[in-house]
Structures are given as C-alpha cells and as structure tokens.
Amino acid sequence: MATQEQKIIFRKMEEILRSYPKYQKRIEVEIENLKNPQIKKSCGPGGQGGNSYDYKSEVEQIEELKQRISNNISRYEEIIFRIDECLNIVQDHKDYSFIQLKYFDNKTYEEIADVLNISLKSTYGMRNRILEALEIHFKTQRLIEF
C-alpha cells in the first residue's frame, strides 16, 4: 500500500506525464507565433490609450514579443527534454507501455486492460511499478520536488 506521500508524488508525476503532449503542441503553436508575431492592441495601463510614458515602436514591440515567444519555446523544450531523459532511462521496463496508453493516448484503466489483455487489477499494478521506476529520475531531473 502506497503511503500518503507516495500518492501525492504519483499524482504530480501523472500530471507531468499528461502534460507532455500539451507541451509538444504548445511548442508547435509558439513556433507559428514566432513566424508571424501579432501585437495585440489593448487599452489601459501599458497599452494603447493608457497613461504610460513608456511608448515603444512597433518594431521594438515585435522584437520583445519574439523574445518572449523564444523564451517560452526554450522553457517547453527544457521540460520535454527532462521528461524524455526520464522516459529513456525506463524504456526497457516491462510496464513502459502503460505510459503511452494512459498518459499520452488518454486510455482508461479498463481500455488498457482490454488492449493488453490483462485484468483491471493488473493495470493498477503496472501504474505503480512504472511510476516507482520513474520517481527517482523525476526527482533527479527536478520535475518534482519533495
């Protein structure tokens, strides 16, 4: 039986694994934004019509926007790199297929049991074993802190 601390850690790990495809998609979106940066016109402080004395040319605004987008891409790539490092270390684990099915394909435990032709109880065991194997690597990569 997992301790309360273990359950919290596993939940954090699962959240990170579920977010992995979202980070990949976000990079694609940001690359498109970088190709065609759009300055949003806004009203209020700091925007068009505001009382800010810090007026920047459109070129400066576009350059700042490109820099922010590049920073976002770098952050997402760093997170993906760290997750990939962890996954590469455990890719030979007998329960590795669970990660793809559960967190990337969003299958339920019942669907995983059907796909793998195993009992429902066995899917929970797979989850626990693969997350236990990943835990130290997630901590080493500072994806989770505890």
Segments and roles (model prediction):
Residues 1-89, 136, 140-146:
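N-terminal interaction/assembly modules
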Residues 79-82, 93-95, 126:
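N-terminal positioning helix adjacent to the helix-turn-helix/winged-helix DNA-binding module
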Residues 87, 91-94, 122:
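Short coil/turn residues that cap or connect secondary-structure elements
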Residues 91-105:
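Short amphipathic alpha helix immediately N-terminal
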Residues 111-116:
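Short alpha-helical "recognition helix" segments of helix-turn-helix
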Residues 117-136:
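DNA-recognition helix of helix-turn-helix
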